[in-house]
């Protein structure tokens, strides 16, 4: 039964409700200038997208997709000034991507309350982003290289294999175009932020096109003694000899000499005063010599061929190589009642090599009055991550007086090991259409192998699992633009955690039932949706309370129920809006650590957002947004709760070509996030490890588009 908290009045919810038009509303204001390419691989237009490949791996209209799918377009990313994927998702329902606060080293994304790491829910161009969440070898893609972000909410293992129960996030790279386009920009702002970026594409001839994208950015960040620095470039080449065949080659190269801050502070001293004083949001409990360096290389191809009116083929593959170096001093709590923080040291060196491929055949045919889109696919993923890890002690620190020269750290433990992962999957899907009925049935078999080998101790732990995942959905598309639907789906997520005997635990599984209603006024790109879901994850790993060492037992469930609303609309040719609301109820069940009926940490009970963009005369565009993050528990024991927070963002852009034809294509844009500079805790991993939210930031961009 949905709690009465769902009906709590708020201005954001009212704004969302007001955004829903009546089904019978006329379309006199619709202005059509040209028919754009609506395919999911094409360049996005405005704030709305009509299609997505995320839920079905086929180019499917969102209005007839029986699953919750949100699309963040290129314009939305640019208008909101997102510098990370996590920031790009802040106005998306069912997603909490801000719990890392001002720490932006990794894209921390929670979907429908499940934050299963930075590996199992991130995909690039439809293939898994080959990170290792069990180490610090986690990749990050800069939004400057992204055309769109598709968020597919709900279990998705029937097509993608290993994934978290809450869904997957698919990043679509910018592609070469057969027309000349260029984008150049310089950026500066608070925290000594500086950056430059370019993006140029053109045709070589009628069969070949190329694109070259690059960027650099640096910042002193909001934390003392830390710095972020990035250099990245991506060349790509497209061969399209005819309308039936295409081959895309791409490389993504990135170097992060400084990965910024990724520490945490106790709740006592942040949420509450410690000995009468509170720690500043700029507090860094580490040492100035701490460092995180990351190098990424991704080489990929994508091939499409249409054999005839029925059969077509798709093949994609990638090779990934990453190197990571980490030296970090971190706090482990107050020393008694003193002002000193006890600290430890963690070090890591990692080199990861990964291969990934996805191949499928597609058949479009009819049997009587029933139209079919059938796909048969095979995937293979593997990585090997060679690691050195070290741990030890570091000198205590008084965070109120700041860093003073310490005696350094001592390494008391080190290990040379490697982590290996293999996944082989075969999947089948049939999308059937009869009149207005849309039935989608899919299934997948996966063999997942996880292995950890310690070269130091000579031990090896290996686990192999076979699993079948399924999905079925039914949707009815009415002529007036309404589409009610019902779906059932499953997920599998390997745990890779050690049990008492040293063996790895079996994967967790999940299943969901979702019902929803979508509305798209005929002839428009506006889209309004509501979804209600019931999602259960089983065999969740729980720390064994009877053993002092870090061992786990497969016990417990996490039950997620919720309601999500979303609206993307073009109210007038000048005014575009995005609105969302999320109510999410999470509970532990059947646990062995005393947390039954508790709510997991990092799970706000409500979230809401509203963003509006308005084009004024004389080339001026303004945008403003509000984000509400509801209350959340700081720990799984539910002993402390973080308060809700409301944050304001804004944007203003001046197209200088409206003032002088000599400056056509030039623009100036200013973005401000957390305008009120609210101090808040964005999330806690228990009461001992909390993150300050991102402080106010202001950036100015001077750019040129053609």
Per-region residue spans from a language model:
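Outer-membrane beta-barrel translocator/receptor signature
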Residues: 130-131, 136, 145-147, 158-233, ...
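Acidic/polar loop-and-plug regions of large Gram-negative outer-membrane beta-barrel proteins
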Residues: 217-221, 234-306, 321-352, 395-419, ...
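Structural signature of Gram-negative outer-membrane beta-barrels, strongest in the C-terminal barrel
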Residues: 238-242, 352, 371-375, 379-383, ...
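Surface-exposed extracellular loop regions of Gram-negative outer-membrane beta-barrel proteins
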Residues: 257-270, 382-387, 449, 475-519, ...
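Membrane-embedded beta-barrel scaffold of Gram-negative outer-membrane proteins
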Residues: 302-318, 322-328, 484, 507-589, ...
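Gram-negative outer-membrane beta-barrel transporters
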Residues: 436, 534, 554-636, 676-679, ...
């Amino acid at each position: 039964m949905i709690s009465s908290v769902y009906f709590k009045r708020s201005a954001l919810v009212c704004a969302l409700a007001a955004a829903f038009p009546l089904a019978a509303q006329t379309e006199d204001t619709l202005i059509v200038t040209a028919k754009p390419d609506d395919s999911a691989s094409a360049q996005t237009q405005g704030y709305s997208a009509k299609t997505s490949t995320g839920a079905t791996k086929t180019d499917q209209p969102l209005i007839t997709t029986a699953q919750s799918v949100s699309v963040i377009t290129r314009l939305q990313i640019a208008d909101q000034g997102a510098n990370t994927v996590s920031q790009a998702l802040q106005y998306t329902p069912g997603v909490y991507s801000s719990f890392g606060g001002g720490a932006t080293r990794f894209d921390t994304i929670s979907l429908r309350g499940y934050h299963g790491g930075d590996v199992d829910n991130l995909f690039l161009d439809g293939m898994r982003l080959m990170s290792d969440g069990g180490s610090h070898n986690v990749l990050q893609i800069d939004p400057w290289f992204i055309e769109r972000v598709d968020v597919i909410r709900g279990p998705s293992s029937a097509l993608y294999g290993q994934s978290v129960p809450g869904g997957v996030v698919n990043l679509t790279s910018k592609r070469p175009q057969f027309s000349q386009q260029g984008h150049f920009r310089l950026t500066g702002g608070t925290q000594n932020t500086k950056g430059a970026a370019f993006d140029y594409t053109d045709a070589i001839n009628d069969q070949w096109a190329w694109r070259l994208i690059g960027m650099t950015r640096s910042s002193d960040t909001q934390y003392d003694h830390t710095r972020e620095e990035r250099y990245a470039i991506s060349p790509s080449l497209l061969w399209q000899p005819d309308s039936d065949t295409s081959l895309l080659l791409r490389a993504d190269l990135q170097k992060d000499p400084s990965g910024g801050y990724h520490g945490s502070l106790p709740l006592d001293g942040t949420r509450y005063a410690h000995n009468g004083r509170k720690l500043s949001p700029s507090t860094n409990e580490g040492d100035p010599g701490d460092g995180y360096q990351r190098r990424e290389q991704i080489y990929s191809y994508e091939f499409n061929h249409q054999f005839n009116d029925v059969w077509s083929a798709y093949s994609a593959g990638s090779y990934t190589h990453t190197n990571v170096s980490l030296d970090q001093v971190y706090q482990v709590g107050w020393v008694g009642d003193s002002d000193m923080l006890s600290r430890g040291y963690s070090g890591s060196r990692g080199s990861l090599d990964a291969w990934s491929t996805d191949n499928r055949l597609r058949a479009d045919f009819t049997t009587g009055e029933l139209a079919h889109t059938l796909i048969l696919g095979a995937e293979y993923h593997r990585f090997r991550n060679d690691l050195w890890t070290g741990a030890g002690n570091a000198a205590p620190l008084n965070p109120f007086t700041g860093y003073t020269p310490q005696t350094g750290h001592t390494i008391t433990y080190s290990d040379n090991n490697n982590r290996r992962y293999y996944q082989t999957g075969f999947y089948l899907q049939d999308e059937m259409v009869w009149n207005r009925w849309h039935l989608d049935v899919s299934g997948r078999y996966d063999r997942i192998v996880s292995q950890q080998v310690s070269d130091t101790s000579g031990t090896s732990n290996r686990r192999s699992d076979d699993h079948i995942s399924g999905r079925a959905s039914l949707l009815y598309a009415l002529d007036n633009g309404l589409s009610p639907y019902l779906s059932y789906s499953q997920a599998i997520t390997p745990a890779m955690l050690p049990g008492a005997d040293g063996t790895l635990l079996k994967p967790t599984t999940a299943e969901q039932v979702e019902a929803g209603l979508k509305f798209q006024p005929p002839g428009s790109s506006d889209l309004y949706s509501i979804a209600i879901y019931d999602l259960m994850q089983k065999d969740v790993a729980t720390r064994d309370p009877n053993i002092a060492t870090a061992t786990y037992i497969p016990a417990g469930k996490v039950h997620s129920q919720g309601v999500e609303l979303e609206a993307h609309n073009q109210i007038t040719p000048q005014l575009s809006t995005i609105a969302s609301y999320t109510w999410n109820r999470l509970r532990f069940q059947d646990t062995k650590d005393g947390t039954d009926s508790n709510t997991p940490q990092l799970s706000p009970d409500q979230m809401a957002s509203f963003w509006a963009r308005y084009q004024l005369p004389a080339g001026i565009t303004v945008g403003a947004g509000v984000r509400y993050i509801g209350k959340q528990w700081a720990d799984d024991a539910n002993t402390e709760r973080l308060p809700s927070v409301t944050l304001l963002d804004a944007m203003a852009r001046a197209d200088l070509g409206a003032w002088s034809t000599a400056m056509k294509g030039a623009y100036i844009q200013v973005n401000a996030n957390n305008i009120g500079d609210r101090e808040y805790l964005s999330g806690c991993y228990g009461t001992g490890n909390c993150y300050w939210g991102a402080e106010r930031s202001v950036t100015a961009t001077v750019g040129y588009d053609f």
